[in-house]
Amino acid sequence: MAEALVDFHCHLDLFPDFEELVRECDAAGLYTLAVTTTPRAWRRNHNLASATRHVRAALGLHPQLVADHGDEIALFEALLPETRYVGEVGLDAGPARFRSLERQREVFRRVLVACASAGDKVLSVHSVRAATLVLDMVEAHLPRGRSNVVLHWFSGSKAEARRAVD
């Protein structure tokens, strides 16, 4: 059995040599999910990744950017049919982002509803200091079997981790 390496959450487009990194990941056989932070960044990532065997682009709206880019949720919803992969999305209730938490919740709810409607999505979900809230929202808006969720930046308890696995 051949071994394969997977990086399920990498912000390749935040590096100055983004295009070269995509080529290097592909040449090395490193399966990479290139998550985006805004829907406007997705097209460039998708175009580069679609020319590779090992790199895929994910459509995202990062919770840390929702205060300034939350209006891009309509663009997110419009682009969603073009991809199976979604990330980075979620909630960040850390001190620096707590003021935008209600807006984050609304955006994340719309992401989950859109993914539930489309089905067969794979989500990379940011969950800083918000594990219970993230799990509550996933359970409420993304019925089991409609998509798969991987928690990223999980800072929850053991009980929350068990709940996520169950």
What do the PLM-derived regions correspond to, one by one?
Residues 1-166:
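Mid-domain alpha/beta scaffold segments of enzyme catalytic cores
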